[in-house]
Design a protein with these regions (language model features):
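Detector for methionine-enriched segments
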Residues: 42, 104, 177-179
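A surface/secretory-pathway sequence property marking extracellular, secreted
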Residues: 5-37, 94-135
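Short, polar/proline-rich extracytoplasmic segments that appear immediately after membrane translocation
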Residues: 1-51, 61, 175, 184-190
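C-terminal, structured domain-capping segment
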Residues: 53-82, 89, 133-190
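Alpha-helical structural elements
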Residues: 36, 44, 65-67, 126-127, ...
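Short acidic, flexible loop segments centered on an aromatic residue
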Residues: 83-97
Length: 190
């Protein structure tokens, strides 16, 4: 099965600090929630099949046949420098499909790939950073976000066919994730 992906901005960060998120760099139509187009089905692929220009090819949803891709911006329209956290939370996993899932983040052009540690060796997968926890794929802090700054994110999610954990056992599986942008990090007690 495919996947669903949304991005939400913490109300306090939006209201108190005048932080906005948007997917169109021209219109800059600020929202509190953004949503990538869903994929009905996602087959496993190699990272090498993802276009090299994925970070610059489009804004908003620009999914491929077997991956979710979404580009958006965060802008500080306030008068104070702030720090913010961004986290990608794993909402639901069916048939252990998270064992082969990859989350690639381009943050202002810098690429990082996150993956669950190998189930057999308990080591990070090749050229990846391990998921932060069982329920959080990514947790990072952006410091010194000054007035007028704009951060660009491109998020890409796929199932890595070259992952040793990508077996027939995950066929028909599903994964749902969402991203939160907030002023303070709060431990999730789920």
């Amino acid at each position: 099965k495919g996947g669903k992906f949304t991005i939400t901005l913490d109300q306090r960060l939006a209201t108190d600090n005048h932080i906005v998120i948007y997917e169109d760099s021209i219109a800059k139509d600020g929202k509190r929630k953004l949503a990538a187009r869903d994929l009905e089905f996602m087959d496993n692929i190699s990272v090498n099949w993802i276009p090299a220009n994925i970070d610059t090819e489009a804004e908003g949803s620009h999914n491929g046949e077997n991956y979710i891709a979404y580009t958006f911006y965060i802008e500080n329209k306030g008068e104070e420098t702030v720090n913010y956290w961004y986290t990608i939370l794993i909402d639901d996993v069916i048939k252990n499909v998270d064992e082969a899932a990859r989350v690639m983040i381009y943050f202002n052009g810098q690429k990082t790939i996150y993956a669950k540690q190998n189930a057999y060796t308990n080591e990070p997968e090749n050229e990846t950073i391990p998921f932060y926890s069982e329920k959080e794929a990514v947790l990072e802090q952006r410091k010194d976000f000054a007035p007028g700054n704009i951060d660009k994110f491109t998020i890409v999610i796929w199932l890595e066919g070259d992952d040793p954990d990508c077996t027939d056992n995950i066929l028909g599986g599903e994964i749902k994730m969402h991203m939160e942008i907030r002023e303070e990090y709060k431990e999730s007690n789920e």
